[in-house]
Amino acid sequence: MKILVALAVLALVSTQLFAEDIRANDDLNYWSDWSDSDQIKEELPEPFEHLLQRIARRPKPQQFFGLMGKRDAGHGQISHKRHKTDSFVGLMGKRALNSVAYERSAMQNYERRRK
């Protein structure tokens, strides 16, 4: 029984020492590999390199449109329109704050379309 325990301890110690030797060599080479950008470009496959370039490239502030669309630098889009207080226009479309007024306007739109 003591022989089995001794063999197990010897195996664990040898694997720890072997793993430390590999880890020490990797630490030294890790930073030197990243310092040479030409070597990295040669090792990367083409689609992966293209993906990294797209991630690294940032859009200019005037290129970002977002959910509200393209913005004018001079004036806002709302300034030309008449403000209606009884309706709300969001991402899901026009919603009435007053349901009676919304139903009335829906009926008027329906009647106009029928004519």
From Swiss-Prot:
Claim: Transport is one of the keywords in the record: no
Site (Cleavage) location in chain: 59-60, 63-67
Localization of this protein: Secreted
Stated family: Belongs to the tachykinin family.
Gene name tied to this protein: TAC1
Modified residues (Methionine amide): 68, 92
PANTHER family: PROTACHYKININ-1, TACHYKININ
Functional description taken from the UniProt entry: Tachykinins are active peptides which excite neurons, evoke behavioral responses, are potent vasodilators and secretagogues, and contract (directly or indirectly) many smooth muscles.
A GO biological process held by the record: chemical synaptic transmission
This protein's UniProt keywords: Amidation, Cleavage on pair of basic residues, Neuropeptide, Neurotransmitter, Secreted, Signal
Record-given protein name: Protachykinin-1
Main location: secreted
PROSITE patterns noted in UniProt: TACHYKININ (PS00267)
Propiece residue ranges: 20-56
Leader sequence residues: 1-19
Gene Ontology MF: a single term: substance P receptor binding
Any single GO CC term annotated in Swiss-Prot or TrEMBL for this entry: extracellular space
Matching InterPro entries: Tachy_Neuro_lke_CS, Tachykinin_dom, Tachykinin_fam
A UniProt-annotated Pfam family: Tachykinin
